């Protein structure tokens, strides 16, 4: 059970980081 919990936390953190980078870089890409 511990492995599943750690994997879930890892994916959650990676997802949050990915969203943060996407939201920060999206305005720069759309701004032409």
Swiss-Prot record:
UniProt-listed Pfam families: PsbT
InterPro entries assigned: PSII_PsbT (IPR001743), PSII_PsbT_sf (IPR037268)
Coiled-coil regions listed in the entry: none
Biological process per Gene Ontology, one example term: photosynthesis
UniProt cross-references to SUPFAM superfamilies, sorted A to Z: Photosystem II reaction center protein T, PsbT (SSF161029)
Keyword flag Membrane: yes
Cell compartments where the protein resides: Cellular thylakoid membrane
Entry's transmembrane regions: 3-23
Cellular component aspect of the GO annotation: photosystem II reaction center; plasma membrane-derived thylakoid membrane
Alphabetical UniProt keywords: Membrane, Photosynthesis, Photosystem II, Thylakoid, Transmembrane, Transmembrane helix
Signal peptide start and end residues: none
Main subcellular localisation: membrane
Topology in membrane: Single-pass membrane protein
Keyword Chaperone belongs to the record: no
PANTHER family in the cross-refs: PHOTOSYSTEM II REACTION CENTER PROTEIN T, PTHR36411
Assembly, per entry: PSII is composed of 1 copy each of membrane proteins PsbA, PsbB, PsbC, PsbD, PsbE, PsbF, PsbH, PsbI, PsbJ, PsbK, PsbL, PsbM, PsbT, PsbX, PsbY, PsbZ, Psb30/Ycf12, peripheral proteins PsbO, CyanoQ (PsbQ), PsbU, PsbV and a large number of cofactors. It forms dimeric complexes.
Purpose of the protein: Found at the monomer-monomer interface of the photosystem II (PS II) dimer, plays a role in assembly and dimerization of PSII. PSII is a light-driven water plastoquinone oxidoreductase, using light energy to abstract electrons from H(2)O, generating a proton gradient subsequently used for ATP formation.
Similarity field: Belongs to the PsbT family.
Protein name, UniProt field: Photosystem II reaction center protein T
